UniProtKB/Swiss-Prot annotation:
Sequence segments annotated as region (Linker): 491-505
Domain POLO box: 408-486, 508-590
UniProt modified residues of type N-acetylserine: S2
Regulation: Activated by phosphorylation of Thr-208 by AURKA; phosphorylation by AURKA is enhanced by BORA. Once activated, activity is stimulated by binding target proteins. Binding of target proteins has no effect on the non-activated kinase. Several inhibitors targeting PLKs are currently in development and are under investigation in a growing number of clinical trials, such as BI 2536, an ATP-competitive PLK1 inhibitor or BI 6727, a dihydropteridinone that specifically inhibits the catalytic activity of PLK1.
Protein name: Serine/threonine-protein kinase PLK1
Entry's EC annotation: 2.7.11.21
UniProt function note: Serine/threonine-protein kinase that performs several important functions throughout M phase of the cell cycle, including the regulation of centrosome maturation and spindle assembly, the removal of cohesins from chromosome arms, the inactivation of anaphase-promoting complex/cyclosome (APC/C) inhibitors, and the regulation of mitotic exit and cytokinesis. Polo-like kinase proteins act by binding and phosphorylating proteins that are already phosphorylated on a specific motif recognized by the POLO box domains.
Annotated organism of origin: Bos taurus
Protein localization: Nucleus; Chromosome, Centromere, Kinetochore; Cytoplasm, Cytoskeleton, Microtubule organizing center, Centrosome; Cytoplasm, Cytoskeleton, Spindle
Written domain comment of the UniProt record: The POLO box domains act as phosphopeptide-binding module that recognizes and binds serine-[phosphothreonine/phosphoserine]-(proline/X) motifs. PLK1 recognizes and binds docking proteins that are already phosphorylated on these motifs, and then phosphorylates them. PLK1 can also create its own docking sites by mediating phosphorylation of serine-[phosphothreonine/phosphoserine]-(proline/X) motifs subsequently recognized by the POLO box domains.
Biased composition (Basic and acidic residues): 349-362
Length: 602
């Protein structure tokens, strides 16, 4: 049996690309880089706590963000670091002071944790909760429209966090997907208090607002004075975006967008549940006094009558969950008991999904080529810019860790002369693409199975309970798993299942081929992975994030935005691999077209 294994491990990190996780980066990004080097060890002079600076997480404005760990307790945080040389103007200092002042006064399950701040002669350091699963912005880029139960799950937590803010007289004023962070348990954490303000007395209307919020309310645009209602408007925009897949007033021109907001010009697609449409319309009332208050929202029928999962699996970040086997939110028989269960309870009580096999219907919005055309266009664009032929190449400026892939192939074994290709994903699940074009995946819990027919329909089974027709394939899958455990990786204990995993669906291997130089693997979530045989370098391309992850000979794992590589350039090594990737994606598209022509003629 021939075999080869990929390498590269990766821990996830917080935040929005282009800013620190949980707080705004003040100022504009055009400023010159600071002359001073950020120290490897950050020392809080008051508490004498020492933090070790770790992996780079993102940048934006004047700030850079790193993973930092307490030298004594080993506890890990996100450290936002701002050079004082870029905080020279009084309003810049004042803005940062206000942001810190508001954020440090807050402590809630759905607000990014604030763990302190300090400074030395050159930098201001802010210590924040680490949100390893980034933000709803990255989720939106990968998934576009979510299922209704997922939207309900996230919105409920956003509302709870915002209830706490309003209860403490804080208006956030910039609620948007990129400021709603996710921890390892996919809990929402409201962050970035750079535009937040505190209401000093009842009835106070704020007149000024610096910056340009994404989901700006009409009363802010008209400068008539605004208050807590602007956050409810923003949540209406967020709800629309989560369910429809794009913001309600979005255009390519800012002026046109603002005109649409002023005229309340938006439309809700017909396929959206009327109960959801009704709540969106209530929150997007042009008259702020006509909107529900933050404390009224969770009593709306959208929340009281629909299925709310208690937890969601990590797979939801890239693949829709298994709600085809969960109760429909539109099923009247499910409404009454759920209403009763949700009333007065701190946490929603999920309805147990029916335990039965049921194929998942592929979403209509999914492109036929699984985003290969988009990827080809992105690669054509970056290659045409000749990124390695620059006088000054600044590849590090193109790095964007927020675009790190959720899944990639960590091991593979080719036994296609008899059975198929076996592979392991980075979460330790194992799959086989059989020669008959069916797929079988064993989850990391060692028992759950996902079977994908040739037509893409999916069934969910277990090792202990499955039809006789799958006995041979399950036996082969176990054989592949054992081979990879013994030869290609350190054998590890089974992972303990977590709540929400019963809703998980994993991406699967759509197709693959080998050349003399590499193996090319195309996953169902759109990612293409290329493992080069000679030097063991790897590329993972994601068309939805428009990003590439490059794993070099030293197993160094770095993720870049393709548009930024066009701007800042890259090394000759990466450029040659991107040219190769374009040819391979072209080949994937050509073979897909040929297969479709064959199907049509048969």
């Amino acid at each position: 049996m021939s075999a080869a294994a990929t390498a590269g491990k990766l821990g996830r990190a917080p935040a929005d690309p282009g800013k620190a996780p949980g707080v705004a980066a003040p100022g504009a990004s055009t400023a010159a880089p600071p002359a001073k080097e950020i120290p490897e060890v950050l020392v809080d002079p008051r508490s004498r706590r020492r933090y070790l600076r770790g992996r780079f997480l993102g940048k934006g404005g004047f700030a850079k963000c790193f993973e930092i760990s307490d030298a004594d307790t080993k506890e890990v945080f996100a450290g936002k670091i701002v050079p004082k040389s870029l905080l020279l103007k009084p309003h810049q200092k004042e803005k940062m002071s206000m942001e810190i002042s508001i954020h440090r006064s807050l402590a809630h399950q759905h607000v990014v944790g604030f763990h302190g701040f300090f400074e030395d002669n050159d930098f201001v350091f802010v210590v924040l909760e680490l949100c390893r699963r980034r933000s709803l912005l990255e989720l939106h880029k990968r998934r576009k429209a979510l299922t209704e139960p997922e939207a309900r799950y996230y919105l409920r937590q956003i509302v709870l966090g915002c209830q706490y803010l309003h209860g403490n007289r804080v208006i956030h004023r910039d609620l948007k997907l990129g400021n709603l962070f996710l921890n390892e348990d996919l809990e929402v954490k409201i962050g970035d208090f750079g535009l937040a303000t505190k209401v000093e007395y009842d009835g106070e209307r704020k007149k000024t607002l610096c910056g340009t919020p994404n989901y700006i309310a009409p009363e802010v645009l008209s400068k008539k004075g605004h208050s807590f209602e602007v956050d409810v408007w923003s949540i209406g925009c967020i709800m629309y975006t989560l369910l429809v897949g794009k913001p309600p007033f979005e255009t390519s021109c800012l002026k046109e967008t603002y005109l649409r907001i002023k005229n309340n010009e938006y439309s809700i697609p017909k396929h959206i549940n009327p109960v959801a449409s009704s709540l969106i319309k209530k929150m997007l009332q042009p008259d702020p006094t006509a909107r529900p208050t933050i404390h009224e929202l969770l009593n709306d029928e959208f929340f009281t009558s629909g299925y709310i999962p208690a937890r969601l699996p990590i797979t939801c970040l890239t693949i829709p969950p298994r709600f085809s086997i969960a109760p429909s939110s539109l099923d009247p028989s499910n409404r009454k008991p759920l209403t009763v269960l949700n009333k007065g309870m701190e946490n929603p009580m999920p309805e147990r999904p029916r335990e039965k096999e049921e194929p998942v219907v592929r979403e209509a919005s999914e492109p036929v080529d699984c985003h290969l055309s988009d990827m080809l266009q992105q690669l054509h664009s970056v290659n045409a810019s000749k990124p390695s032929e620059r006088g000054l190449v600044r590849q590090e400026e193109a790095e964007d860790p927020a675009c790190i892939p959720i899944f990639w192939v960590s091991k593979w074994v080719d036994y296609s002369d008899k059975y198929g290709l076996g592979y392991q994903l980075c979460d330790n699940s194992v799959g086989v693409l059989f020669n008959d074009s069916t797929r079988l995946i064993l989850y990391s819990d060692g028992d759950s199975l996902q079977y994908i027919e040739r037509d893409g329909s999916e069934s969910y089974l277990t090792v202990s309970s499955h039809p006789n027709s799958l006995i041979k394939k399950i036996t082969l899958l176990k054989y592949f798993r054992n081979y990879m455990s013994e030869h290609l990786l350190k054998a590890g204990a089974n992972i303990t299942p977590r709540e929400g995993d019963e809703l998980a669906r994993l991406p699967y291997l759509r197709t693959w081929f080998r050349t003399r130089s590499a193996i090319i693997l195309h996953l169902s979530n759109g990612c293409v992975q290329i493992n080069f045989f000679q030097d063991h370098t790897k590329l993972i391309l994601c068309p939805l994030m428009a990003a590439v992850t490059y794993i070099d000979e030293k197993r160094d794992f770095r993720t870049y935005r393709l548009s930024l590589l066009e701007e800042y350039g890259c090394s000759k090594e990466l450029a040659s691999r991107l040219r190769y990737a374009r040819a391979m994606v072209d080949k994937l598209l050509s073979s897909r077209s040929a297969a479709n022509r064959l199907k049509a003629s048969s």
